[in-house]
Amino acid sequence: MKKSNQMVEKGSQAYYERQVSMGRSTLLVVLCLTVANLLLLLSNTNFYLLFSASVPYYLTILARGYDLAAFGAVNQTYTWAAVAVSAVVLGLFLLFWLMSKKNSNWLVPGLVLFGFDSLCLLLMCRFIFGGFADSLLDLCMHGWVIYELAVSIRAARRLRDGAYKV
């Protein structure tokens, strides 16, 4: 596919290839911003970036809070365990992004994993945060990522089936 900013005809092969590429890019941006959020959290910076996965971030926050409450921040066992679990989740996102370069079907497990992350965010908003108002922008961004991944999966399916304008 040519890398250009030219308009492509809707329904053409280039159009669907661009949609798949955008889905892959969205997955990579989520991965990078989640890593940045975890690094900001571990460096005690009071700053949060939207457009990232929620489970690794909030799991690490909960573990840090438990370490502070139980050990006075002397022992960070739970924090590092949460970072290890977060690394596994981020490793899965990276795997799905890398594998989707050759086979765009790997975007499907990426969508499922991010959908699970979004469900966890909804449940945290409802039962832990006490409402959706504080996380409304985060929920909207999660919805946009899910939409972007779903569009790219549909485009990949159309490319595979040859259902595009020639």
Where are these regions (language model features)?
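Topology signature of small-to-medium multi-pass alpha-helical membrane proteins
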Residues: 1-166
